[in-house]
Regions:
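Short, hydrophobic alpha-helical segments
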Residues: 135-146
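FAD-binding beta-loop-beta segment adjacent to the flavin cofactor pocket
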Residues: 74-113, 118
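Class I S-adenosyl-L-methionine
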Residues: 1-75, 86
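Generic alpha-helical structural context detector
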Residues: 30, 67-70, 100-104, 136
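A helicase ATPase "motif cassette" and its flanking acidic/Ser/Thr-rich regulatory loops
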Residues: 127
Length: 150
């Protein structure tokens, strides 16, 4: 959710139009990843189960569009169960680099923290492309008001 406010009643802000996505999750995957990202035989039944209690959901693997990363819900049962992909016949989780790509970060962006911290940070990040588009619309609104100074 994005909220934009102006202290000027003459401001005529319009959110950017939706853009058609031209990439799928599969396009953002790394061709080779470390073994640590693959799920062990011990955890696999839990991931592939339909959940328990009020958290029942059919597990889906290899989605074209990733589910929200849910960093703030990481301790909730199966909160992020669907962000898994298959590679070489095995199921794995997304790497921090792949999560960064999902949020619009370039591959040149340095990830100087542990994987667990990176997952939290990218899960809580604001998508780069959306932020840029909203900021450009804010700038256009200020320009139209004659209040923009470079």
């Amino acid at each position: 959710t994005y909220i934009v406010c102006f202290d000027n009643q003459n401001a005529r802000f319009e959110f950017p139009e939706k853009k058609k996505l031209n990439k799928t999750l599969q396009d953002l995957l790394e061709p080779e990843v470390d073994d640590k990202y693959f799920l062990s035989d011990r955890i696999l039944p839990t991931i592939l189960s339909d959940g328990t209690g009020g958290y029942k959901a059919k597990s889906e693997i290899d989605l074209k569009i990733a589910r929200p990363l849910c960093a703030t819900m990481a301790k909730m049962h199966r909160a992020c169960q669907d962000n898994y992909v298959t590679q070489k016949g095995k199921i794995r989780r997304l790497t921090p680099r792949e999560c960064a790509r999902l949020q619009g970060f370039e591959d040149s962006f340095v990830i100087p923290v542990s994987d667990s911290q990176a997952y939290k940070q990218f899960g809580n990040a604001v998508t780069v492309n959306v932020s840029r588009a909203v900021a450009q619309s804010v700038k256009s609104t200020f320009i139209n008001l004659g209040e923009w100074v470079d």
